[in-house]
């Protein structure tokens, strides 16, 4: 505070500079025009004009200037004196979405003229678009229903043209699209049926707007069974480290509102912050477990001592995780609920509730502070201490019953430009420890800065702490203090105020104050009706212009409830109803509103809660929820006169000017509002002349932008099966997950009545509506509920799917909510589709009393595939036999309840997939290809299914699947590169063909960034890379992989940041491995033997590295490249002179290396030699290894080509396409024939069989695609026809060339023809899937699988056993490449992860991975020495009559070398009874 003595004289100096020196200043004309600093095009904007102390008529004009010219916003506006006049204007659309322009305002009269020019930001107005799906999660085969809604920034509907909407699957495929459609009433509905075998995972609906913006909405596709009940876990949200106990409650509630009977198990854990799987549970968490029975209300309560969690220990998370499992009585169905409690060290906390943001010297500074405990509960009757050192203020006060204290600080003697108020309750704990958390009592502190006013006049808006509620009128108090000496004979002073919201001026007003020629002090109120136009944040500015030219003012920010003008209400009548009965849904909204209705089963919301449409989510769509400050380019330069830094001598006192950066002037208040001011009034404080370096603190920069948080469909119409006594028996078979999905229009009275039929599900239906009106805009209803319930019913418990022949237990539970006992008979209707045997020997009628239940079970073995219906009836019987002490009653209505539910039955055996690819180019004519789909003799009956995909781009499938190109695991440094490199080729290709969209670019760059980070995990300290990195004990870098990473990182620099050090280090490391003859030494172990077999090891590796260096690209004159080319040229010369020649693989690499180096002669020589060894068949060309292994016997279809052959053929293709200066027509003809063969080897994802072949082939295909791409307006027609009655047609053009169009083929086995006419090329991919029963055959691996124990004799064998594997290589080579052992789990079992992780301690195991039902084990290689591996599995869900599970071992790089074995659980026959 030592500067205070200097600051005071400086303020006096500033007053001398600004105060008028004679009365002639009185009445000087003042102009002020206020315009938002951000203007939106094609919408109404407002600017406000204030003219004061004028004695003549003036006109006001405004114009906007950009690089393309000037445009007048308004001209010759006549404004009255002392009246705040606001004028509306529109800004034309700009060619760029965001642009800085110059705004010029001119005020002109007979004797007065004022002109000022400043910058504003102009943004094109964009629509607000959201998507609503009927659910957030779907099963395969269900229909996705969704709506696209568009509004303006006032939430009024927009009937805009939407260029594109599409659905994208988890692999990135665009599986459906809708183009160029007009919204009606601001919305449009769509639907899309999912296939029976879709990819499971996260999908999204993408809306592409005309402006180029896009909106995405996610949904999930999974196989699931809806939960029957909710597990509600209640724990304290916060507990402090001092609490000794906590209360936990767990309740089970059915979706129809009744309590769940059953058993609960609760676990409360505090997890270790650095948990480990290797040292048991103690290294992971402190846990407390307990269990018990649910009471009659379905609840369980427990008081838990917190001592076990050691709340003050530091090494553990500051959270308690509570997990509760409820096991339903009878069915043994288990569902889980979770909650967490935050552990806080904060025992008490002080915070300012209301406090002035600035202080004005001489006006008391007000504040209100609240004291709460660690849970936020107010603490009354406690003494708190308040201090404001700059004002010499020290006080204490006692909190009231709400924990509040008010205070007021006299600011008369504050000498500085800031006032800091500190409030505390208790001092910090003196106890500190490295491992311990100490209690904390949080203080509150607030710094307020001085408001600059040379006139010593002020106006101040009272702060408000609460959110302003909709529909109310809020009163704001404005306090003022006026210095009589500045009024200069004025009789009435006008205070003007305006409100800004959503970035624009929305309201204005004036308050007149009669003044006297003396100092005045007082307050007045401003009334603000709270409506949607000022939500979600209102900024209020108040100001007055004094006769001296000084402007006094203040601004305040008020949070406003997210109001919507269209008030929507939704209600069911009745609110509870019987299944299949009639009900009414009543909607009220603004007249003529279009209302979108939705009602879903509460079970769906329990399965996956929705991101519900709400006022908050809609307001989050706004581009500007609040405008404050100026964007960086718009900060104005201060053109006013500055003060020199020389000392001033006045009346014997020397004054030293000091810069008061933090003082708040009127300009700062306007900047807080985001307003640009055109004025000749004094709104700025003086600033120092910039003679020396000075530092200024700028106000907030940038715009505050909010982001989105993220055909009428008929209602389901349930129908009762017609029986003679419809009230006696109910047959329930209609169980939709979405019940209502409708559009309705309310009438002129604002009401719509919708008649509905309640579905058969006994549950609670949750309904919602949003409505759009041209006048009132958007409205959203609160949730309405209808409970579908009947007091006596039967429900079925069964899994999502089962395997044919695998027995499962079907359970039927009869529930009686009648007040009396009933005697019930339960029957399962027989069917040829399954065999059912009662679990209980006797099927006698059961006695069920009030609120009771009875579960009846059958062991069911399905015999048919697909959806199999199960029909179960429960009937209340007339009987005189007592139930307990009473005679059973028979319900008057609904004495028999029948439920019909389907179950998906899947085929047994091992699934096989065969892919047939064709690239057909009609060139104005017609081309066709025959397709014969045959099935092997050992196919599982009814298991075959096939589909055809149609794409207009050769890379279409691959570019949508860059993260899923292989149907294999990605667990090492080389395999990671197949996630990385193809993105570069896709980006290059789309750039060159001008097809690159922002969406694809963004996605590909995202993959490049993550792949780059992941690849650095495999880097060594010396700059090299290896397959599993140093952390797996591979201490030597790998020459081949380092070259691969080097060239790919170098190529990725065009799209993402790559640290040059990684490139330099890898290049240096490689150059150190170059020998004197220019060839490279091999270093590190390669997992792929394809390039290290035979005498030409060194040449092949050297060719690969030379290619990598030239692709960086390094020039041929670079020393390392020059020497490497010498090595290759010498090797080629030797090969030509020798008898044995070169390996085909080596020649393919040499051809491409010479092509890259520009050595056309050598390229032609090698290609000529290769052409002599080419395999030519069916107008296609490829190359094979001379000693190609025999194809395994027993393949029904020719297997996919080996990885090495795809790779070498792709290198030849690259050599043809890299001719200098460009490929000739002969080169392209040869390339086309090669492409025909390569595309036939692609898998369903667009990749190939392994890593290198995928990377090189996609590189080659992208170059071929770019070389042959033509953008034509013509289209190709595709016809797929069977020899029977099936026929399907597609069209492929520029608009849908990247759309994956698909159709299922119904006739299997079958003969099909595929015909293409028109222009362009069409890529057709047929996928045939079927199951087979494994047969004994000769494999190149010996694979043995056993379980320990092998039999069911041991007591633990039901729930746990070991899997023991033995693997060796018996093929034609000395050892395999890297191999993967894939162990599928037996149904109902899961692996024990720590035992799987232990396998990595073996020298032969590089890595392990665990998925939901598979264990993957990576082996460096497999030789003829047997490897033994074992791990433990645990029972997760009981399943009877288990089918065997498959274990597969395969060579990662020669995928046609594999072996299959199967195993079963020791107790496979009777696990269902366990």
Swiss-Prot record:
Organism: Homo sapiens
Expressing tissues: Secreted in plasma.
Ribosomal protein recorded as keyword: no
Main function: Is able to inhibit all four classes of proteinases by a unique 'trapping' mechanism. This protein has a peptide stretch, called the 'bait region' which contains specific cleavage sites for different proteinases. When a proteinase cleaves the bait region, a conformational change is induced in the protein which traps the proteinase. The entrapped enzyme remains active against low molecular weight substrates (activity against high molecular weight substrates is greatly reduced).
Gene Ontology MF term list: calcium-dependent protein binding; endopeptidase inhibitor activity; enzyme binding; growth factor binding; interleukin-1 binding; interleukin-8 binding; protease binding; serine-type endopeptidase inhibitor activity
Protein's UniProt name: Alpha-2-macroglobulin
A Pfam family: MG4
Coiled coil: none
Listed GO biological process terms: negative regulation of complement activation, lectin pathway; stem cell differentiation
Spans annotated as Inhibitory: 704-709, 719-723, 730-735
Name of the gene encoding the protein in the UniProt record: A2M
Cross-link type Isoglutamyl lysine isopeptide (Gln-Lys) (interchain with K-? in other proteins), residue numbers: 693-694
The keyword Isomerase is annotated on this UniProt entry: no
Family according to the record: Belongs to the protease inhibitor I39 (alpha-2-macroglobulin) family.
CDD domains: A2M_2 (cd02897)
Alphabetic keyword roster: Bait region, Disulfide bond, Glycoprotein, Isopeptide bond, Protease inhibitor, Secreted, Serine protease inhibitor, Signal, Thioester bond
InterPro entries: A-macroglobulin_rcpt-bd, A-macroglobulin_rcpt-bd_sf, A2M/Complement_sys, A2M_N_BRD, A2M_TED, Alpha-macroglob_thiol-ester_cl, Alpha-macroglobulin_TED, Ig-like_fold
Glycosites: 55, 70, 247, 396, 410, 869, 991, 1424
Disulfide bonds: 48-86, 251-299, 269-287, 470-563, 595-771, 642-689, 821-849, 847-883, 921-1321, 1079-1127, 1352-1467
UniProt cross-link Isoglutamyl cysteine thioester (Cys-Gln), position: 972-975
Oligomeric and partner information: Homotetramer; disulfide-linked.
SMART domains, alphabetized: A2M, A2M_N_2, A2M_recep, Thiol-ester_cl
Signal peptide region: 1-23
Cellular component, GO annotation: blood microparticle; collagen-containing extracellular matrix; extracellular exosome; extracellular region; extracellular space; platelet alpha granule lumen
Region (Bait region): 690-728
